[in-house]
């Protein structure tokens, strides 16, 4: 079979990671998820926590960072260093001679020009995501709602910082799936 790459991005709380893992298992391909963070942090020469903290700071300072030019702060330096390391890791892994699924980490944008690839976006209605989070993590409805909105905002800001695009837009997506449909999971 010819090598292929699938990137999967998603809304928080829609059980997309489980869908992505099942797809990778069914297809018998590599699955890259949170291990991308570890590899990128190592390559950037920063701790995993610093890498994740730099992403969180992107959310807190997104407007300032998007408008700034150059390295205005150590946070931005770490963010830029972390992003570059992550992009390099994703490209290095995609250049291997094996098929793979990349989950999140802006891989849809990073690999947009690679041959034989498909970008998938998984989503679900807010109510379904809240219900899933309540059942899976024993959260109250208001806690789950607040968490989903915060994480979605963070991911949107991070995606915008890295790509200049809006996460979830149809541009650069080949397939969008509502995972609330019971046959998907």
Predicted region positions:
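ATP-dependent small-molecule kinase phosphotransfer cores
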Residues: 41-99
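Short beta-strand-centered segment that lines the nucleotide-binding/catalytic pocket of NTP-utilizing
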Residues: 30-41
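A glycine- and Lys/Arg-enriched "phosphate-lid" helix/loop adjacent to the NTP-binding pocket
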Residues: 120-163
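Pre-Walker A (Motif I) flank of P-loop NTPase domains
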Residues: 2-11, 98
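Glycine-rich phosphate-binding P-loop
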Residues: 8-21
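Conserved small/polar residues in nucleotide/adenosyl-binding loops
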Residues: 184-185
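Short, flexible turn/loop "capping" segments at secondary-structure junctions
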Residues: 111-112, 167-171
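ATP-dependent NMP and nucleoside kinases share a basic, alpha-helical "lid"
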Residues: 89-137
């Amino acid at each position: 079979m010819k090598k292929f790459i699938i990137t999967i991005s998603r809304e928080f709380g829609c059980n997309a990671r489980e869908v992505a893992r099942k797809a990778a298992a069914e297809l018998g391909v590599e699955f890259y998820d949170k291990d991308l963070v570890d590899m990128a942090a190592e390559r950037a020469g920063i701790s995993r926590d610093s890498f994740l903290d730099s992403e969180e700071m992107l959310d807190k300072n997104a407007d300032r960072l998007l408008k700034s030019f150059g390295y205005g702060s150590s946070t931005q330096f770490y963010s830029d260093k972390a992003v570059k390391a992550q992009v390099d890791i994703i490209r290095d892994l995609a250049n291997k001679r094996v098929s793979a699924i990349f989950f999140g980490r802006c891989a849809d944008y990073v690999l947009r020009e690679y041959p034989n690839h498909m970008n998938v976006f998984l989503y679900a209605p807010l109510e379904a995501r809240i219900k899933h989070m309540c059942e899976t993590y024993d959260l109250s409805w208001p806690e789950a709602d607040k968490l989903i909105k915060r994480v979605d905002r963070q991911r949107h800001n991070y995606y915008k910082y890295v790509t200049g695009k809006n996460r979830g837009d149809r541009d650069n997506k080949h397939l969008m799936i509502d995972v609330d449909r019971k046959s998907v999971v």
